[in-house]
């Protein structure tokens, strides 16, 4: 838990394929992975919540526990209604070089790049997705969104004209509305060298 919390509100995840650990915020008191059931299940204890069902003759002032079915649907559905499960993925910074020899395409950041368009390659897209191109002139600077972004992508979007320019570019794909889900394919940009300053 965070230092000001008395309940579990953080999680750690290990990616076996890449050998990488990540941390995140996730309020869960207990968790059981898929195996006995088709999906993982978890509980979350909320100390200031009243249970949704009454207990005859007892006033519960100790809070309530919620049961979650993970990896099931695209939204969070409970007694309070349906809310979106916001998610995003962001690439690392990448740069380009003006070298044409395939053996020397190391992306050394010598040149600025002009990103004319983003070409969506969603294998699955339910609802919309938001694309943000972050551009940066130097590694120690704070990356900013391209002037025209963020961009909304639908299942009928062929391309997005971006007019982004920077030495370093990273891409964020996000969803923040109910009923949205996506699976992305290959990153596709129309980019070219655009000078040294």
Would you name each region that the model predicts?
Residues 1-197:
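Beta-sheet repeat architectures centered on beta-propellers
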């Amino acid at each position: 838990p965070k230092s000001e919390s008395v309940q579990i509100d953080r999680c750690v995840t290990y990616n076996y394929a890449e050998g990488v650990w990540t941390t995140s915020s996730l309020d869960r008191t207990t968790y059981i992975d898929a195996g006995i059931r088709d999906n993982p299940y978890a509980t979350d204890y909320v100390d200031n919540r009243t249970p949704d069902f009454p207990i005859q003759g007892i006033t519960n002032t100790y809070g309530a526990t919620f049961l979650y079915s993970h990896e099931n649907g695209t939204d969070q559905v409970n007694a309070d209604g349906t809310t979106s499960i916001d998610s995003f993925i962001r690439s690392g910074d990448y740069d380009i070089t003006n070298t044409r020899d395939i053996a020397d395409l190391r992306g050394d950041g010598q040149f600025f790049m002009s990103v004319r368009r983003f070409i969506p390659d969603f294998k699955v897209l339910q609802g919309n997705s938001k694309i943000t191109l972050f551009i940066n002139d130097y590694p120690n600077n704070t990356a900013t969104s391209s002037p025209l972004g963020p961009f909304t992508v639908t299942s009928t979007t062929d391309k997005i004209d971006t007019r982004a320019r920077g030495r370093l570019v990273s891409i964020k794909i996000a969803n923040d509305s109910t009923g949205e889900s996506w699976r992305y394919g290959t990153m596709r940009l129309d980019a070219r060298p655009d000078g040294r300053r």
